């Protein structure tokens, strides 16, 4: 039952990274600037971020099967719209709609899996589902570039759209929300008022914001790197799109191991959250500085090694969710995870357009077949901003609360109550 929703999530992740592969094609087809390409990419993240909370309500209210099938149909329609777009408005609308449909895929796959697998296997299920997403991001690099080379970028979107519609149909016909006779089928859906109240409590908790902001800036760097690494390798190293996409897959390949390994080490070995998050973010900053310092001079093997190292250190992101969950009431764990997860998508959405403008500001007027060719100085400026994002993420991690893998909300609440209690008259508070 979980396989079809997971396959839909796989395609959603392909769409997340696809603009990096087709950036030059979009420039050629529409005369687009770097800022336009960045804004196009961000449309996915804007819709994903804006619809993340309602997506959870829909899944709980209408069932995962129907919601995933509808989301996949919407995502497929958006992909088809991008494939036939003759102007930027339809291209942007299609990208936005793709993100809208993709919003339900991860939550829905977990919901289906949780109903069909024992509770003791949920952590493994979540890790495997996240790994499916990483595999999708890999498929969105070299394999997608190979498909574009054969079918063209429009053909690739049409193929993805049709495949997604087939999966939507299979989901509606074959997937079931619960095993027959399951008690979960009778569980009441959360009310809108209850969800809103929980959201207010989570947002009002000051300990929610450090993991939110750390993920915001970390994913701002990661998202922009995924968007511009293929154009960088094409413009500076004169690689083909297919060759550049092969190198661009390095971070995702590394995350296949680093994400699960980071979670395991945090849970079972060091039994810390803040410490590994801070250390790995510091390592990421060092790698970013090395990457920026060697732009255009490092052999391609060295570029691949640095990108792979970025992916290894980037495994820190998996700690964002437990850090958000463990400082909030256990009954609000779902909302807490959704809120801190929102930080990463907003980080990508709000920065990709402006970073494209940074490239445009340093463009020297050179174009090839209608696509802008940016000089090394432009990429140096853009990737330096990404390094700056990582620095801010590191500083934010210093404000994280160490949970040691346990929910500490009650401890934090008692601490607030103790500080707000007036000291005894004539004495001192301790």
Model-found features: residue ranges?
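Juxtamembrane intracellular "pre-TM" segments in multi-pass secondary transporters
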Residues: 178-212, 414-430
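Helix-breaking motifs and short loop linkers at transmembrane-helix boundaries and internal kinks
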Residues: 31, 63, 84-90, 118, ...
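Cytoplasmic helix-loop-helix junction between adjacent transmembrane helices
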Residues: 94-133
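Extracytoplasmic gate region of multi-pass secondary transporters
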Residues: 19-21, 205-262, 321, 348-356
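Extracytoplasmic
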Residues: 1-34, 50, 225-230, 351-355
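Conserved MFS/SLC helix-loop-helix module at the cytosolic interface between two early adjacent transmembrane helices
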Residues: 50-89
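Helix-loop-helix hairpin linking two adjacent transmembrane segments in secondary transporters
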Residues: 129-179
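Paired small-residue
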Residues: 74, 78, 89-97, 301-309
């Amino acid at each position: 039952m979980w396989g079809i929703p997971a396959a839909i999530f796989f395609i959603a992740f392909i769409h997340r990274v696809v603009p990096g592969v087709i950036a030059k094609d979009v420039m050629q087809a529409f005369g687009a600037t770097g800022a336009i390409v960045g804004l196009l990419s961000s449309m996915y993240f804007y819709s994903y971020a804006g619809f993340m909370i309602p997506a959870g309500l829909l899944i709980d209210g209408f069932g995962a099967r129907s919601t995933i099938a509808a989301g996949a149909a919407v995502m497929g329609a958006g992909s088809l719209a991008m494939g036939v777009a003759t102007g930027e408005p339809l291209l942007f609308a299609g990208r936005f709609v793709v993100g809208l449909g993709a919003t339900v895929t991860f939550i829905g796959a977990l919901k289906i899996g949780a109903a069909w697998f024992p509770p003791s296997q949920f952590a493994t299920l979540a890790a495997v589902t996240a790994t499916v997403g990483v595999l999708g991001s890999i498929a969105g690099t070299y394999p997608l570039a190979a498909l574009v080379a054969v079918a063209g970028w429009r053909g690739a979107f049409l193929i993805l759209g049709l495949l997604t519609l087939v999966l939507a149909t299979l989901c509606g016909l074959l997937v079931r929300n619960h095993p027959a006779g399951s008690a979960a089928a009778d569980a009441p859906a959360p009310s809108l008022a209850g969800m809103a109240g929980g959201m207010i409590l989570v947002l009002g908790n000051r300990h929610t914001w450090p993991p939110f902001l750390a993920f915001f800036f970390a994913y701002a760097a990661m998202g922009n790197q995924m968007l511009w690494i293929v154009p960088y390798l094409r413009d500076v190293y004169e690689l083909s799109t297919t060759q550049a996409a092969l190198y661009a897959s390095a971070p995702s390949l590394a995350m296949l191991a680093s994400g699960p390994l980071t979670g395991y080490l945090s849970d079972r070995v060091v039994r810390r959250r803040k410490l590994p998050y801070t250390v790995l973010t510091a390592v990421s900053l060092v790698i970013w500085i090395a990457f920026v310092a060697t732009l255009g001079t490092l052999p391609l093997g060295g570029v691949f090694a640095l990108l792979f190292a970025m992916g290894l250190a980037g495994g820190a992101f998996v700690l964002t969710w437990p850090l958000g969950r463990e400082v909030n009431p256990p009954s609000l764990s779902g909302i807490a995870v959704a809120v801190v997860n929102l930080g990463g998508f907003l980080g990508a959405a709000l920065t990709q357009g402006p970073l494209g403008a940074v490239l445009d500001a340093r463009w020297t007027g050179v174009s090839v077949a209608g696509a802008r060719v940016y000089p090394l100085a432009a990429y140096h400026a853009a990737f330096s901003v990404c390094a700056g994002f990582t620095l801010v993420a590191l500083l934010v991690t210093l404000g994280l609360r160490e949970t040691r893998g346990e929910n500490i909300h009650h401890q934090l609440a008692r601490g607030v109550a103790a500080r707000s209690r007036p000291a005894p008259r004539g004495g001192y508070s301790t």
